[in-house]
């Protein structure tokens, strides 16, 4: 479902933008913030290009501490945050908020571990879907959920959208292939879901 975002006056938008940029500048480097129109235009929509909205600010953190600090700061300012992976989705899931911050997680792109014995991988949320299969290929393994955008889409976006693909007819959707997720609430509190082991049958 696409939710219509408010249309603030230019003065309201500029005033809030200045407050948000000033506050976020205290928790992330200057190069991690984008707010000029020419810089934020690529973030106006995801793959559903019929709907566009320029975000107030785009933030590109590089560490988990920065993500947490950004979320806490925005929560204190009562500014909405929309997380964004590669922006390939067709559901409007990464649609920006006119008076909000787009939190780009593209820099979290490391594959931390591939374990052929347990047939598991530990990856950051910005890792491309296809990159996981490429890393597992030397062990004759692959990551089953394979959306048509797998060459570009990220695992974080796949988790958020419960992405599928042709292989899902046999191996299930993303939810059936992810054991554990670590992240933050919108208030910036750390959370974990699942575990590193499969559930015991029964």
Residue ranges and their predicted role:
Residues 1-72, 89-119, 148, 171:
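N-terminal flexible segment immediately upstream of the FAD-binding catalytic core
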Residues 76-77, 97-98, 177:
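Short, well-ordered loop/turn elements at secondary-structure boundaries
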Residues 110-202:
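FAD-binding subdomain of flavoenzyme oxidoreductases
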